[in-house]
Amino acid sequence: IESLRRFDPDGPLDAVQAVIPMTGEVIEIRLAAPRPHVLQMLAQPQMAIFSRDGGTGPYRRKAWGKAIILTPVDRLSGGDEPEETPIPVWQTRVIRAERAALAIVRFRERQAALVLGGRLTDLPLLVPAGIDRNAVRADPVQGLLGLAVTGRGRLLDNAAVRAAINMAIDRSQLPALLPIGGWATSDRLIPDQLDLGRPPTEHDWAALSMDERRAQASATITRWRTDRGPPPPLRIALPQGPGATLLFGLLRRDLGAIGLTARRVPLSSDADLRLVDEVAAYDSALWYLGRVGCARKIHCSNDADAQLQAASLASSPTERATRVAQAEALMVAHNGYIPLGAPIRWSLVSKRLNGFLPSPRARHPLNHLFRRTN
């Protein structure tokens, strides 16, 4: 809980006062105030409970070379059938962690029935690998896919420059670069109303055409150059992979169109803009605001952060919602985060895995790959 609170200080777990063991199998979590999304937080994989013998999940694991074999727990702990009864092959899982390109080829050659964890970085590998479109399953996730402003200095401390960068990106070109069914771009910080109490805040330039946006953004950069000289290159931190390369090409082109130069750097390096690619753990405006707030070392609005802290201390749900809505409007106006769309999460699934279902959290329990589960 402490670990999650460090990354989400204004989320549902902010109200946890104590965790008390009641019995060997029951714990009590005491809250200082009601939090409607606390159960969704507790359902995250990070909240799994471990014992000296391992986890509490449906499998026991055993190393097998570079792979891991997962065997159903009920077959090892005195289930309905004797232990010597052979375990059906369909109940055993063999898992590997490897590069996306190798996993995709392994799937194509039918040496693997499932590939999990696909992101935008590796999406362009599917077509040249000859993967059947019907095997590609996209998860209907929401969350953050965009650029956090993490640099400081005269250029990015200028509110008009941050707004110019945000409005200059032609998001309509992204689906052609990253083709996957059901994915949509967005320039909103929060995709839907959720618990905001009103529709998400629109940028004041949202109704402008792309040409009008670029003209306005270019004028901003021209004024900055006239007053202060040539702007420094923007360092953009992106992961490795062809999808990130295509994304950088679009960003470099669009920023160049308004007079800014861009340089790609690794995620481990200092950067001015850094890719954020996270699936929402729960459906609340607080999740989104917490991910781009001051606690994440992003160029942030202190006033918005103060409203978030006030929301945590609010004495009523109405006051809490009001504070959150005020924080959202301030964060959008600050332009410390540049939205691109929803995160992209995909899997490759064999036809025989008839229990596999799309997941709004991109989580796929391995004991639910067939309609009959262990």
PLM region descriptions:
Residues G24-V26, A32-P36, Q44-P45, W64-K66, ...:
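Solvent-exposed coil/turn segments that connect beta secondary-structure elements
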Residues G65-I69, R93-R152, D277-V279:
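Extracellular/periplasmic solute-recognition and catalytic clefts
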Residues F107, F248, R253-I298, A311, ...:
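Periplasmic binding protein-like
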Residues E109, V141-R188, P232-A244, S316-N335, ...:
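Alpha-helical secondary-structure segments
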